């Protein structure tokens, strides 16, 4: 499956996260783990694309993100959890949509490497302004907090997101993606 993901995000302080969590009452959090994948020579990063296997309690998904003028085109391939665990341990990828799309970008590696993992506890709720996700993520010795808003229209979404943040007394500052934060921390550890 493929779809255009237009997402706005902000890193939060722990107290901001705790305040916002009150707005997610009744929402059961989902634990998800992202395993970031690249070639040994970082061919994906060089081409500005990102790939991960994300595991949930009883299923998994292989995702390729390709930047567009606005947002990322996301290619998702659903996996059985046991198959995902097998691919991760062997550092192999399944045939299908993601490998086909990589080939279109001139990437036909058979050499994959799992860079590491980032685990997120996510509260997600559909709001009038878009799909909102409140995340607490752990990677290496870091815990960070993030608010994401997935929208249909970037400009309207930006306006709505800023109003939401203002109403909640949080100043907007664009946040790097989880992968960028993970890789930066990987270099520092």
Label for each model-derived stretch:
Residues 1-189:
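Phosphate-end processing signature that detects enzymes handling 5′-triphosphorylated RNA
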